[in-house]
Design a protein with these regions (language model features):
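N-terminal membrane-anchoring/stem segments of glycan-assembly enzymes
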Residues: 1-42, 363-366
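Long helical/loop segments within the catalytic core of UDP-sugar-dependent glycosyltransferases
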Residues: 18, 109, 115-116, 140-171, ...
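Membrane-embedded multi-pass helical conduit in multi-pass membrane proteins
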Residues: 43, 279, 328-420
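A conserved acidic beta->alpha catalytic loop
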Residues: 50, 68, 75, 85-93, ...
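Acidic helix N-cap motif at the loop->helix transition within catalytic regions
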Residues: 60-64, 78, 89-98, 141
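Conserved donor nucleotide-binding strand/loop of the catalytic core
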Residues: 76-82, 93-123, 161, 207-214, ...
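Short aromatic/hydrophobic "clamp" motif used to bind/position activated sugar donors
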Residues: 129
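Catalytic donor/gating beta->alpha subdomain of glycosyltransferases that bind UDP-sugars
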Residues: 150, 154-167, 202-216, 249-254, ...
Length: 424
């Protein structure tokens, strides 16, 4: 086989493994060699939990978030709530003070999320640490579901599930219910058109993010079923206090570093989809790109904050870690030479020509997805502009999401190399 052809097939196999082969292999392993929790791991229980939230200038939503935590189905005497203010200049501390001794506060100068979490753990008095964000809300039974797997002594950390509220039907119902009291009634067809226009402005990226997130969650479920998932959901995860190690101040992904340290210590990190937190998907490609840049920059950072993760004799989940976290970082650098090689080789075989055409179609679909995003934003103003649910449009939105993710990986590396600040 000529060298160029060999390189083409090597790159094609690599990209296919990352996005298709690894998820399929995981699912097969789950079927053949599942590793269920010990039977007592599903037993009901209410161990003491310390809930820690690092917040900066979140005063506008802190009251709603604290109320959500106080209304969870969990005994008040087994629950400690700690809000760490990372240099807030708004009324965040005043909001927390209104709750008296029920909610504890820690005021720090600006130092970053990792330092704030370390300070919160220093105040924690219970055996289980629960980490959450100020923006998302927990389901009423989230805490009970999150702590249940810890009755299996092999479990060191548990990740909950982040539910993205981007479904058009559900959002239409919520928007329709948000009319101001006393406002005049609106004709159903007028209200429906108005609602559809607002939903249109959000549909392109929301749909792409939603599809990607469902794909990602299935990978996490399968990883968890055979051993450990690679990290946790930052909005809702828990770990044993005894396994906590202080985070370096510059840490970007506490929700990956802390759980993976549990894996290195010989414990499992499991995914519990009954422990749900709710959030909104990004409303445009720029916002989603910034989120992914932060996440992927954090994945690069992991490699030198905890280099033992790259050592197969130290990391019992080495194959999963390399396949899920490391290989994805390399995909953006495989795509350009793969396209160029298929172009050069396209005259030699229909296989290479088909590969070249397929890649061109992918990039064209991604470009069309970017156009759809602008079109959908215009639909919020133009009653004649309508978002399409046609299959080509859905494929375009997915292609745009994949392209955004890979571009964000490159931007994430640039952010790390230039020491840009990616957590605010």
């Amino acid at each position: 086989m000529p060298p160029m052809a060999g390189l083409f097939w090597l790159l094609a196999a690599f990209v296919a493994y990352v996005y298709i082969g690894y998820p399929l292999a995981l699912h097969l392993c789950r079927r053949l060699w599942p590793r269920p929790l010990a039977p007592r791991g599903r037993a009901a229980g209410t161990p003491g939990v310390s809930i820690i939230i690092a917040a900066r200038n979140e005063g506008a939503q802190l009251a709603r978030r604290i109320d959500n935590l106080l209304n969870l189905d969990y005994p008040a005497d087994k629950r400690q709530i700690i809000i760490v203010s990372d240099g807030s200049t708004d009324n965040s501390l005043d909001v927390v003070a209104q709750y008296g001794p029920t909610v504890e506060s820690v005021a720090l100068p600006v130092g970053g999320k990792a330092r704030a979490l370390n300070a919160g753990v220093d105040r924690a008095r219970h055996d289980l640490l629960v980490f959450a964000d100020a923006r998302q809300a927990f389901a009423t039974d989230a805490l009970r579901a999150l702590v249940a797997p810890f009755s299996d002594p092999d479990v060191g950390a548990v990740s909950g599930e982040l539910v993205l509220e981007g479904e058009t039907r559900d959002r239409r119902m919520r928007i329709s219910d948000r009319r101001r009291p006393g406002a005049p009634a609106v004709a159903p067809d007028v209200e429906r058109r108005s609602t559809d226009r607002r939903l249109a402005a959000e549909s392109t990226v929301v749909e792409g993010v939603g599809l990607y997130w469902r794909y990602e969650k299935q990978i996490r479920r399968d990883e968890s079923a055979i051993g450990s998932t690679m990290g946790a959901t930052g909005a809702v995860y828990a770990m044993r206090h005894s396994l906590w190690r202080r985070l370096p101040d510059e840490t970007i992904l506490d929700d990956v570093l802390a759980p993976m340290r549990c894996v290195l210590a010989g414990f499992r990190v499991v995914f519990e989809d009954r422990a749900r937190a709710f959030d909104r998907a990004a409303r445009d490609a720029k916002t989603e790109s910034l989120r992914k840049r932060r996440t992927l920059a954090g994945n690069y950072q992991l490699l030198w904050l905890e280099p033992a993760l790259l050592l197969p004799w130290r990391n019992p989940a080495w194959i999963q870690f390399v396949s899920h976290k490391v290989a994805r970082l390399a995909v953006p650098y495989a795509l350009p030479p793969l396209w160029l090689l298929s172009l050069v080789l396209s005259g030699r075989s229909l296989v290479y020509a088909a590969a070249f055409v397929a890649q061109c179609l992918f990039y064209l679909f991604a470009g069309y997805g970017a156009w759809l995003e602008k079109h959908d934003a215009r639909a919020a103003r133009d009653p004649w502009a309508r978002p399409s649910a046609a299959v080509p449009d859905r494929l375009a939105r997915v292609a745009l999401m994949v392209l955004v993710m890979n571009a964000s990986a490159v931007a994430g590396l640039a952010a790390i190399l230039t020491r840009q600040k990616v957590w605010r």
